[in-house]
Amino acid sequence: MTEDEQRPEGQEPGPASLPRRRVLVGLGLGAASFGLLRRLPTGRRPDRTGAAAPPTATTTTSTTAAPRPTVDVPPALDDSLAIADDGHVHDVVLAGGRVVDPGSHFDAVAHVGIDGDTITRISLEPLTGTTTVDARGLVVAPGFIDVLSYPVNGHGEWFKVADGVTTNLCLHGIDDTMADFLREASRLDPPVNYGGATDQYEHRKKMGVNLDWATEAQIQELAARATADVAAGALGIHEQPEYTLGLAFEELLAHGEVAARYDVPLCLHLRHSRPDPPSLQAEGVDEAIRVAWETGCRIHIEHLNSTGGTGRMADAVAQVDAARAEGLSITACVYPYTFWATYAGSARFDDFQDKYGIGHGDLQVANTPDRVTAAEWPSIRERNLLTAAFAMSEEDVTGALAAPWVMIGSDAILTESGNNHPRSTGCFSRLLGVYVRERGVLTLEDALARMTILPARLLEGVSSAMARRGRIQAGAVADVTVFDPDTIIDRSSIADTGVASAGVEHVLVGGRFVRRNGINDRSERPGLPILRDAE
């Protein structure tokens, strides 16, 4: 959904045909505990047999992961695809780099052999290759997986490559039917892998519902359209209650039931983002938990730092931890910035001073050098310009990174106009450069896990393509990012959003170099669709 739509005009608070409409929003739960939610009558309780175990770590003031024992035995995902012959000449060898595989905790100077699209050997001894890359002093990591991007557009994905991304997943929602999304992505022939979630609001627009309250019949039609997209390969279902102002709780439940049936995540931009009163954001998180509880679906909360956890991250993490302890499957992602951006005409900017406790001087239009003035603001809203709001704190980012179920998602892709948030070009390099190297908030392995193995595991149960990605292991797909840990950094700012990151030296997608020696190779287009497996 483009974020410039306004609230429905002249709407009553939902049609009378929805007797349970907006359950949580109207309950006044405030910061209600999950225990209270459990006592509410639901009529349906999911069978949570075999549900993910609750996290072993608890939220603390320190976000640095506890040290893990170093593993120096080369990992193998599939021994049948591994090559053990010492005389073998690999297609590509990445020689002498620090190989970090968060999925196995392997972290050692080693040599990676690649044949075709597959990693076939990891060795502590030198290997022979037709092409050998000197990776000494560099980190050899699984290719980064962006779980919260937007569809490839022929331009922005090359900035993703420079940021180390090999798989661009639009769990924020695709902008068409799944069939049309795949057709357009194939036409663009991208360098990165691609996939996405069906977007409930796009179907609302096609049906003419837009931001209005949907009738029961329309809700069923929306669920049927989501089902068709999932059957066509969509990896999840996306909804954004904050922007879809006529979205009733029944509609969330209907889509949650589809998500549960196909075991894909229901990806939510939560209903509330304003930090004052704190009870509103708590209700947004509670609503997501309630959907998981009633339907049994998996929930993925989008950009928790800007929606649900702003100014209250410790409490938001505690809410999710409590739900996970009950056996519910809930994850989240964040981007490592303290400002969000959306279009000035969006309802999110209605009464923004009261909502977020900020003023005009905390706003900045993308690709302009100065903060906004009160005199300029009416014109900016009328022109619907992309505007950043400096409305978060560092604790909103670092507090989320303390939770082991939080991964990284950019929530952006650069367009040719350059009109975007700098997270579109620098999200992953910023995490490694600022939050690992400069501030020591995360260990290198922990940071890499949040952009590789965690997103792979989120989706590998429904997409076998993801079961072989996010890993540096023999038998894994050779999606690999090689970067300099001493220089990797984001270079974009809100004043200049279209600057490529620095420090990513080599990127391979399916064993083919799309970036080598710090330069993108635009002749290489090996990206493949990442789809839900057919039944």
Language model segments and positions:
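C-terminal segment of N-terminal export signals and the immediately downstream linker at the start
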Residues: 38-95
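Active-site neighborhoods of metal-dependent hydrolases
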Residues: 206, 210-213, 222-245, 290, ...
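Divalent-metal coordination cores built from histidine and acidic residues
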Residues: 80, 135-140, 145, 149, ...
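Histidine-rich, glycine-flanked metal-binding segment
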Residues: 71-93, 98-141
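Acidic, glycine-enriched loop/beta-strand segments at the rims
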Residues: 82-84, 100-111, 397, 439-448, ...
